[in-house]
Regions:
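Loop-to-transmembrane alpha-helix entry segments
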Residues: 70, 101-106, 119-142, 153-159, ...
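Glycine-/small-residue-enriched transmembrane alpha-helix faces in small-molecule transporters
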Residues: 1-44, 81, 89, 138, ...
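C-terminal-most transmembrane helix of multi-pass membrane proteins
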Residues: 2, 47, 145, 250-296
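Specific alpha-helical transmembrane segments that line the substrate/conduction pathway
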Residues: 41-52, 91-124, 242-261
Length: 296
């Protein structure tokens, strides 16, 4: 696939991460009953709307029908399955723990990606990355052990465990993108992920509880927080290295708690701030050092 100019690819990743970061604050605007008891319904509608958005793009804008989906082959299937895991686990995590805790667990993605890239792509891991892994793990352990037994969201430790599956799936997805970016268009995999996620959630989502206002918010999530930014990330990954994608993706972790604080009054706990500072510091320093070393 044809890569974009480097600066344009960076811009796409910044837009994608910013759109991803609105998930928490928009979710908190749903009716309390939907937040508390409709976690499967929320995931279903969000995934379905994302699939509609991406499918509509291929049918109405590119006018290619379903050919790109078939052309994606096994990499598209792997990527689609990983998108489905991320779509499901992220929203379920938000129903059990805070936005800040969820996003900070997601911030382990770059380090998990480095480990997987080492195993699959034979990419070497510098000593600074091992140091960052240790520091980030310490931050996550601090967040987990200091978390209260119950919060406004419900069960924080369970939520953080569910959230951990997101960076794992993201790492598998990113390595798949890296291996195939020159020959396979994996944008259709976002559509496939939405379809798989919606199909798995439908039996658990019934009977529906969402009111028209909730459906409008869920459409915003599906179209602009999920479908569009995931498509942008796939396109940007054709031109950016894995460290660049991971580093720019951390913008979601920085902005997500800010929107939740400003828009939903969800003030991050002291343990989240302390552990998060350690996690983000380790990740950012590691990724910046990696990028500088790559330019030498």
């Amino acid at each position: 696939m044809n890569p974009l100019p480097h600066r344009r690819a960076i811009g796409l990743m910044i837009v994608a991460a910013t759109l991803w970061s609105i998930a928490g604050v928009v979710t908190r605007q749903l009716a309390p009953s939907v937040q508390a008891e409709g976690r499967f319904e929320v995931t279903f509608w969000r995934s379905l709307f994302a699939a509609v958005f991406v499918g509509g793009y291929f049918l109405l804008v590119r006018r290619e029908g379903w050919r790109p989906l078939a052309a994606a082959g096994w990499p598209g299937l792997v990527s689609g399955l990983m998108w489905a895991v991320m779509f499901i686990a992220f929203m379920l995590a938000l129903t059990f723990t805070t936005v800040a805790n969820t996003l900070l667990v997601l911030s382990l993605g770059p380090l998990i990606t480095a480990l997987l890239a080492r195993a699959v792509l034979k990419a070497p891991i510098a000593p600074r990355t091992w140091t960052a892994i240790a520091a980030a793990t310490a931050g996550i352990l601090w967040m987990a052990t200091q978390a209260a037994p119950a919060t406004a969201a419900g069960r924080p430790l369970l939520g953080m465990l569910i959230a951990f599956s997101v960076p794992v799936a993201s790492a598998i997805n990113l390595v798949t993108l890296q291996k195939t970016r020159a020959r396979v268009d994996l944008v259709p995999a976002v559509f496939l992920g939405g379809v798989i996620s919606a199909a798995l959630m439908l039996p658990l989502a019934l009977p529906f509880q969402a009111a028209p206002r909730d459906l409008l918010l869920l459409a915003v999530l599906g179209f602009f927080q999920l479908g569009l930014p995931c498509m942008l990330m796939v396109v940007a990954a054709r031109s950016l290295s894995a460290p660049e994608v991971a580093l720019l993706g951390l913008l979601e972790v920085v902005l997500g708690p800010l929107w939740a604080w400003l828009g939903a009054g969800e003030v991050p706990a002291a343990a989240t701030l302390a552990g998060g500072t350690l996690v983000l510091g380790a990740l950012v320093l590691n990724e910046l050092a990696s990028l500088r070393a790559g330019r030498r």
